Amino acid sequence: MKKLVLSLSLVLAFSSATAAFAAIPQNIRIGTDPTYAPFESKNSQGELVGFDIDLAKELCKRINTQCTFVENPLDALIPSLKAKKIDAIMSSLSITEKRQQEIAFTDKLYAADSRLVVAKNSDIQPTVESLKGKRVGVLQGTTQETFGNEHWAPKGIEIVSYQGQDNIYSDLTAGRIDAAFQDEVAASEGFLKQPVGKDYKFGGPSVKDEKLFGVGTGMGLRKEDNELREALNKAFAEMRADGTYEKLAKKYFDFDVYGG
């Protein structure tokens, strides 16, 4: 009887482990908008590169699955995830209350503050008084767009939405908008530290609103994909513990991108 109970226990344990493994797809289709350097963009060979891309590849390796990247505009990523056209989102996606009503997230991958970028000779600050009558560029589907439309647009500030962060910077340098509003790190590394951004600066301090901007960024998943989320969280915790996360981050940043 003891042998029978032991054998049955082993079978149940194996079946449970097998079921959990089977719940993780052999190939994960990861949606991304490759216009947001240094997190996701394309190099001169047309290859996807960036911190998010490196993180996703490492996470997929650790959970023993293949990852395929699917390019989409940011505002199409959540609808694509819910429609099962993709299995995950890795695109500097802030973890916000509103988004958590629609999808699930992994644990925080890194911090995300939002700031204005303006010309060096500009005195624009992120206040209603300073921005009134100005045109502010934002990326469609971002928390910055939501904040601008809720807090600034009703006060006489024109919020101009774009598909593709590069289009925002192009209009900023051409003088068609007065400021660009985006993630602080993306603006610093992807624009201000590049030759094209030499005549620009941050306009004032970061804009704080935990309800809209969330508590950091994560990988977006469907709510029902609990096993996948747990596996990714475990793999990410291991990356943080063994130094892999820090090694990848140092390729792109000279500061603690994870934050407090």
Curated annotation (Swiss-Prot):
Gene3D superfamilies: Periplasmic binding protein-like II (3.40.190.10). Its main location: periplasm. The keyword Coiled coil does not apply. It is found in: Periplasm. GO terms for molecular function: amino acid binding. Disulfide bonds join 60-67. GO terms for biological process: L-histidine import across plasma membrane. GO terms for cellular component: ATP-binding cassette (ABC) transporter complex, substrate-binding subunit-containing; membrane; outer membrane-bounded periplasmic space. L-histidine binds at residues 91-92, 94, 99, 143, 183. The keyword Disulfide bond applies. SMART domains: PBPb. Belongs to the bacterial solute-binding protein 3 family. Part of the ABC transporter complex HisPMQJ involved in histidine transport. Binds histidine. Interacts with HisQMP and stimulates ATPase activity of HisP, which results in histidine translocation. Has a bi-lobal structure. Contains two similar globular domains separated by a deep cleft wherein the ligand-binding site is located. This is Histidine-binding periplasmic protein. It comes from Escherichia coli (strain K12). The lineage of its organism: Bacteria, Pseudomonadati, Pseudomonadota, Gammaproteobacteria, Enterobacterales.
